[in-house]
Amino acid sequence: MKFYKYISYILHPVLTPIVSTLLYFIIIPNHIPEEFAYRVLSIVFVTTYIIPILLLYFLKKVKLIESYHLSSIDERKFPILFFAILSLLLGNLLLKANIINLLALSFFGITLASGIVYILFFGKIKTSLHTLGIGGLIGFIGIISYQYQLNLLLLLIFLFLLFGFIATSRLKLEAHSMNEIFIGFFVGFFTQIIVYVSYTF
């Protein structure tokens, strides 16, 4: 059981945006100034990792959440809404740079995904954020592959294997049902595609 807990921690969804950003700068053939890339990585790290962690620490301190796992739907509502707003603001900021539009769109995809997750709360559906994160990452890498005509098959296969590990760990830990696992994946994946298609075509 400890193995599955380690998988859940190592592949935590809060890390997805910084991993996506890092892979974007590594993969794309366009020349991006190194200093600019580091600046963007720093902004993404602070906005999507440091700030959410500080928020969770505050919410736990004032006893609005019982644990950092956000086990109940009620505990998830405000953090998800907050993260959606952060992602929207970050997407707008990156879009203004005008040379990393694809990366900016990925954050609009995260905003849309977070919004859908929030709406599903009203149907008492606790979407798996772990599989939402990996689904979004797979969608984003697929978009990069299409946009730049790159063969990223091996990376995509690796990410699908990670999805398998994540899904198995969440099921073994009884954190989610099978439906919640796949809802998370499809919401994460298709929101990236929807935002890209809406902006591009």
Question: Where are the regions a protein language model picked out?
Answer:
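Juxtamembrane helix-capping/reentrant segments at transmembrane boundaries
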Residues: 7, 67-82
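C-terminal halves and exits of single transmembrane alpha-helices
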Residues: 81-99, 120-123
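Alpha-helical transmembrane segments
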Residues: 36-51
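Short, hydrophobic transmembrane alpha-helix segments
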Residues: 26-39
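Short, Lys/Arg-rich, polar N-terminal cytosolic tail immediately upstream
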Residues: 1-4
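Membrane-embedded catalytic cores of phosphoryl/pyrophosphoryl-handling enzymes
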Residues: 103, 108-201
